[in-house]
Amino acid sequence: MESHSKPSPYAKLPDILLLFSQMLTTGVYSTFFLTTYLTFEDAIFQQRLNFYYHSLTYIFLTGIIFFGLALFYQYRNSPETKDDAEEEPPKKSKSSRLYLYFLAGLLIQIILYFLVAGFELLNFFIFLLAASSILGIARTFSVKSKYDSWNHPTTAGGIIEGTISLGTIAGLWAFAGTDLSRVFAWIILIILVFEILTLWARFRYLSRWSYLTQETLQMLLGSHIALFGVRFIFGLIMPLVYIVWVLFISNLSLLPIILMIFVGELSERILFFIAAIDQTQITYKSNENISENIGGEQE
């Protein structure tokens, strides 16, 4: 039957790209927005405001590139991706529309800035769209999903924490060498601790809730152990140890943790989708095993 056919290798890629795009762009925008508008010295505020407006173009282009890649892979193998898309949870609704409104708001502000001047009130509206978009997508994945492995508060927590991490490393890069560097380092340190605790809570849930979640856990620690190792060791433990070393022992550059956290968050999004299984996939796996057994008996 078609419903039990092997899924396309590209089936999950559009969702990975779209979710990572939302986390990256909204996180970076929110960081630059808060860094700018929580500055109370006039000279520094004006300097950061100019940087904020110039960064909008890059944030917008990043969102468009990821969104375009998601559409490309969505239609690359249209029969397979269409079938898989119909089985996905209804996440392409309000939260996705808010994300498109967020990108549209960025475009309008970019045009206004180059033609006349930035419209200050629009910045606050865009920030609300960014926050609403990521909170909405986090809630949708953790509440309205058909995957047992997603229906847990740790799903929303992981998405929100990942968004903050991506935004904070962007701030660490943009304001390297300033007084904000250590502020961002402390924020990243706190978020990394929360992410480790979230991962621990998620593993407890996966190991106890149902057969499907136990299968997901076996996939994470079995066929996807290399990618999980990248996520856990390179994306969590190494930056945590490095930040503690820099903050308390040595005065090294904080920039190396940018790559660690970026790769770690990307690998987390990949694992989030490819390790999620439902009854359909279990049925396909069972049918495949039965076919292999029958073939072996005939031999």
At which residue positions do the language-model features occur?
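Transmembrane-helix bundle segments that line or gate the permeation/cavity pathway
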Residues: M1-E2, S21-T39, Y53-A85, F102-F114
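A near-ubiquitous, low-amplitude feature marking generic local secondary-structure context
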Residues: S3-Y10, I16, T140-V143, P153, ...
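Long, contiguous internal "core" modules enriched in hydrophobic/ aromatic residues
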Residues: L24, A43-F51, E86-N251, I257-S267
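Juxtamembrane/interface segments at transmembrane-helix termini
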Residues: L38-F45, L71-T81, K146-Y147, T198-R208, ...
